[in-house]
């Protein structure tokens, strides 16, 4: 066996390997012993046909094709060792020719990271104040959640809840037909057609109404764009929303911890402030990591992006599946986006995640931010504080190798971000004026 070509570009090595005739012959013997047990040849019991007869029966070309599985993995591994290549992941092997027996391999190499001057990174964290209007909006939402619905003996208004019979066609074909349809009358509603709610306003229970709506040419659903929907609607029941009275009693009913409405508003303020602070912190850290990536030199094998991309797409598909009502709806949504579309859409995110992971990992090792055993044990003690009688059982779970490794990764990430956060919040660096040359100083003094 000999390596006839070797190239290293970035984080990928490429080699071409030619097997000598002795190795090929030994491999064919191994292939024969494997296949002869599976192939029935007339005149011989299974596994008993001589090699020359067997090779004529299945053809030498077929034997060489099968030989790939028998000798290439081992030969590739030996070639990598002989060339002193340190692979980062499984090589991708491809046959070049079978006679002579030549294969090529693309070998991912470990990523390389050279950090920039991260101690010069500066960023500003946003400060968000919660306005009274923001609290009012949340309180209003809570009121609507606790509202009751009562029958109204009047024409339909915006905000009502209706029980109605709907008959309709779309360009003459059946569209939406329901005997008992519940419908919330909202200005912004676009179902079953834009402006449908407006057409219901002022209707009276028991009196049918007919109207038509033309879908806009730029409608999101192409199969509806430009078409005319003709409706016949009979409202059977009109219900109006009754909001509870906003007072101390409402606050206490909502949560016994609250004795006054002011306490409810204060809790809402605190919760909103926490969420806004979390958003500001996330945005702040995104800026820092982006700055660190831009100032650093990063090279990594494509396999890292592919693995991250697969994970992102899998997560997105799981999220999509959990948000739809039926397998049919899930398949319909999938049909609107090909695997290639998804890869193209999420590839930038995968690349960003890989780069982020690499620079932060390099920073952690450079500044020795990986937690020691004492720090990990202390974190486990915090996590099992409320475990009660199951503390020892919980501790044993956290100390399992895989779980403890994940905890170490979490603590490392936390310490690394805290380290770079502290740097970024320092005052801006002042520009340093260059010192004049000593000769220039002397000349100035002589003048």
Swiss-Prot record:
Cellular component GO terms, alphabetical: cytoplasm
Substrates-to-products reaction catalysed: [protein]-peptidylproline (omega=180) = [protein]-peptidylproline (omega=0)
Say which domain of life the source belongs to.
Answer: Bacteria
Listed InterPro entries: PPIase_dom_sf, Trig_fac, Trigger_fac_C, Trigger_fac_C_sf, Trigger_fac_ribosome-bd_bac, Trigger_fac_ribosome-bd_sf, Trigger_fact/SurA_dom_sf
Keywords for this entry? Cell cycle, Cell division, Chaperone, Cytoplasm, Isomerase, Rotamase
Provide the protein's localization.
Cytoplasm
Record Gene3D superfamilies: 3.10.50.40, Trigger factor ribosome-binding domain, Trigger factor, C-terminal domain
SUPFAM superfamilies per the record?
Answer: FKBP-like (SSF54534), Triger factor/SurA peptide-binding domain-like (SSF109998), Trigger factor ribosome-binding domain (SSF102735)
State the EC number(s): 5.2.1.8
**One Pfam annotation, family name?**
Trigger_N
- For the protein in the UniProt heading, the enzyme class is isomerase
**GO MF annotation, one:** ribosome binding
The biological processes this protein is annotated with in GO are: 'de novo' cotranslational protein folding; cell division; chaperone-mediated protein folding; protein transport; protein unfolding
Locate the PPIase FKBP-type domain: which residues? 159-244
PANTHER family, A to Z: TRIGGER FACTOR CHAPERONE AND PEPTIDYL-PROLYL CIS/TRANS ISOMERASE, TRIGGER FACTOR-LIKE PROTEIN TIG, CHLOROPLASTIC
Q: What does this protein do?
A: Involved in protein export. Acts as a chaperone by maintaining the newly synthesized protein in an open conformation. Functions as a peptidyl-prolyl cis-trans isomerase.
What family is this? Answer: Belongs to the FKBP-type PPIase family. Tig subfamily.
UniProt free text on domains? Consists of 3 domains; the N-terminus binds the ribosome, the middle domain has PPIase activity, while the C-terminus has intrinsic chaperone activity on its own.
Q: Which NCBIfam families match?
A: tig
**How is this protein named in the record?**
Trigger factor
């Amino acid at each position: 066996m000999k390596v006839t070509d070797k190239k290293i570009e970035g984080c990928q090595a490429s080699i071409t390997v030619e097997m000598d005739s002795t190795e090929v012959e030994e491999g064919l013997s191994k292939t024969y012993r494997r296949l002869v047990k599976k192939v029935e040849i007339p005149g011989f019991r299974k596994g008993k046909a001589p090699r020359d007869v067997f090779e004529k029966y299945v053809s030498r070309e077929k034997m060489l094709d099968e030989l790939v599985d028998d000798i290439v993995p081992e030969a590739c591994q030996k070639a990598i060792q002989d060339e002193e290549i340190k692979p980062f992941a499984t090589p991708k092997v491809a046959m070049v020719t079978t006679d002579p027996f030549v294969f090529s391999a693309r070998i991912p190499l470990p990523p390389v990271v050279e950090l920039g001057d991260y101690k010069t990174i500066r960023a500003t964290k946003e400060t968000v104040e919660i306005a009274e209007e923001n609290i009012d909006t949340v309180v209003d939402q809570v009121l609507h959640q606790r509202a009751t619905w009562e029958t109204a003996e009047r024409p339909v208004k915006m905000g009502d809840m209706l029980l109605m019979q709907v008959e309709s066609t779309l360009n003459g074909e059946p569209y939406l037909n329901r005997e008992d349809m519940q419908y919330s009358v909202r200005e912004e509603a676009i179902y079953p057609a834009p402006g449908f709610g407006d057409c219901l306003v002022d209707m009276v229970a028991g009196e049918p109404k007919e109207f038509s709506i033309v879908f806009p040419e730029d409608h999101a659903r192409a199969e509806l764009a430009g078409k005319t929907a003709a409706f016949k609607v009979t409202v059977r029941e009109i219900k109006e929303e009754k909001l509870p009275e906003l007072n101390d009693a409402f606050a206490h009913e909502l949560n016994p911890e609250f004795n006054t409405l002011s306490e409810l508003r204060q809790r809402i303020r605190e919760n909103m402030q926490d969420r806004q602070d979390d958003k500001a912190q996330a945005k702040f850290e995104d800026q820092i990591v982006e700055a660190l990536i831009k100032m650093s030199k990063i090279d990594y094998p494509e396999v890292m992006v592919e693995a991250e991309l697969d994970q992102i797409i899998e997560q997105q598909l799981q999220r999509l599946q959990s948000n739809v009502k039926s397998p049919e709806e899930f398949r319909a949504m999938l049909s609107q986006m090909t695997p290639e579309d998804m890869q193209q859409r999420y590839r930038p995110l995968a690349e960003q995640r890989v780069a982020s992971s690499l620079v932060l990992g390099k920073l952690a090792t450079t500044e020795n931010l990986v937690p020691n055993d004492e720090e990990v044990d202390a974190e486990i003690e915090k996590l099992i504080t409320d475990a009660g009688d199951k503390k020892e059982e919980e501790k044993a779970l956290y100390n399992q190798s895989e779980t403890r490794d994940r905890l170490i990764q979490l603590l490392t990430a936390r310490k690394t971000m805290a380290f770079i956060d502290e740097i970024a919040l320092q005052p801006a660096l002042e520009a340093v004026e260059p010192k004049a040359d000593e000769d220039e100083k002397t000349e100035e003094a002589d003048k």
